[in-house]
Amino acid sequence: YNAISAILRGYGDSRRPMYFVAMSCLLNIAGDIIFVKYLGLGVAGTALATVLSQSISMICSIVYLNRKKFIFTFTLKNLRIDRDRLKELAMVGIPISSQECMVRLSFLYLTSVTNRLGVNAAAAVGIASKYDVFAMLPATSIASALAAITAQNYGAGKPERARRSLTAGIGFAVLASSVFFLWAQLSPQTMIGLFNTNPDIIEAGIPFFQSCSFDYLAVSFVFCLNGFMNGRSKTVFTMVSCCFGALALRMPLIWLAYTYCPDNLFVIGLIAPAVSGFMAVYTMLFVIRQLRQDNSGRRKELTLRSV
């Protein structure tokens, strides 16, 4: 299901994966209604609806691509493990998976810490985490697109297009995330009020929203830069960077803030953007260094050709 969408995106087609995912979502909703509401299957019905919807979407996508004569044919005979390709995928995929795990781990630690600060603080941080998903969605999506675009253009010998895509991607991600950032700065109480109207929770959450919302802008740089580096197969760097940010910076700083400023949610919320900003700076420096090496290598190649 996800592999077919990834293949299509790598091929430069992001529209058809969207159609397949939309089909899965609609089938999932219909399945939830049928299995839970009418058949009374409860949680098992929800799980069944998810599995069936994704399976049907996968089968339909395979049939569609085979009929459209895609670049290769999906058959049972072709579904086998190629050791060389598996090694290449593992070298790229495992570091990317590891960096995602580290990011989730640091957010889980933040949740566990804020749960000890009382009901109001825990509720406010929980509401903020819901907005985080939507506020960071543009950066996450653009980072995935940048990885594919960068790989395609470097493979085609057009690095300049990849660099322009990076600049455009960062600009678009920052612009899209700015909507949530400005909302959190100008009217955080309305953001919290959409989920909970308790005045104590709103009061506790306002300083946290105003500080943590800076992370929406910072991660736009980090995610896009990491996507660019992933497209160049520099996945080990992005993995080490994310592990360092989560284990050496974010989690220890959260512990320090909890230990010495337990009642100050503004300080706790400021940790994420501070760490992301620092990561953005050294990642940007690494990218600039890589680009300079590319230019130097290209100049040497042109010099050798002219001799």
Regions found by a protein language model. Name each.
Residues 1-17, 124-182, 186-188, 219-241:
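Small-residue-rich hydrophobic transmembrane alpha-helices
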Residues 1-9, 17-25, 46-59, 140-143, ...:
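Short runs within selected transmembrane alpha-helices of multi-pass transporters and secretion channels
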Residues 3-7, 26-34, 62, 108, ...:
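Alpha-helical transmembrane segments of multipass membrane proteins
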Residues 14-16, 42-43, 120-121, 235-236, ...:
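Membrane-helix interface segments
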Residues 24, 53-57, 61, 65, ...:
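Transmembrane helical elements of multi-pass membrane transporters/channels
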Residues 24-25, 58, 96-104, 108, ...:
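Hydrophobic alpha-helical transmembrane segments in multi-pass membrane proteins
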Residues 27-30, 38-94, 150-215, 257-307:
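Short alpha-helical transmembrane segments in multi-pass integral membrane proteins
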Residues 34-41, 101-129, 134, 152-153, ...:
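Helix-terminus/linker motif at the lipid-water interface of multi-pass membrane proteins
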